[in-house]
Regions:
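Acidic, PIN/NYN-like endoribonuclease modules and their adjacent C-terminal/linker elements
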Residues: 92, 96-122
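Acidic catalytic patch
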Residues: 57-81
C-alpha cells in the first residue's frame, strides 16, 4: 500500500484515521516527495525530523524514490481547477507504477479518474 503524507500526519497527531494509519505503515511505502512533506511538517511543529524519520521507518515504512515515470504520470493526473497538489499527484503516480492502492485522508481523491485504487482512512 502507498501511504499519503496526510495519513502519516494523522498518525503523528493522533487524529481521526490514525488507527488505520499505523496498520498500513507496517508494510507500506511512501514516496520521497510525501516523505519530505511529513518531515517538513514535523519540523514546522517543533519536532526533530531525524527522530520522526527513525520512528516511522521502525514500523517498516519504506521510502521510495520518485522517478521520471512518476513525474510524467503526475503531469497526466493534473487537471485545471484540480485540488490535487504536486505531492498528491506524485503519490497517486507511485500507486499506479507499483500497482498498489493508495491510502489517504483526503476524500476528494476518490473521484480521480485513471488513478489507482484509493482508500480513505477517515
Amino acid at each position: 500500500m502507498v501511504i499519503d503524507a496526510s495519513v502519516v500526519l494523522a498518525w503523528l497527531q493522533d487524529a481521526p484515521g490514525s488507527d488505520m494509519a499505523e496498520r498500513h505503515m507496517v508494510e507500506g511505502v511512501i514516496g520521497a516527495a510525501n516523505w519530505s512533506e511529513v518531515l517538513q511538517k514535523a519540523r514546522q511543529h517543533g519536532a526533530q525530523p531525524g527522530l520522526v524519520a527513525r520512528l516511522l521507518t521502525s514500523f517498516g515504512l519504506q521510502v521510495v524514490d520518485v522517478t521520471a515515470e512518476d513525474g510524467e504520470r503526475a503531469a497526466d493526473l493534473w487537471a485545471a481547477g484540480s485540488v490535487l497538489s504536486l505531492a498528491d499527484r506524485l503519490c497517486l503516480a507511485l500507486g499506479l507504477r507499483l500497482g498498489l492502492a493508495v491510502v489517504t485522508t483526503d476524500h476528494a481523491w476518490r473521484s480521480i479518474a485513471h488513478g489507482p485504487e484509493v482508500i480513505v482512512a477517515r
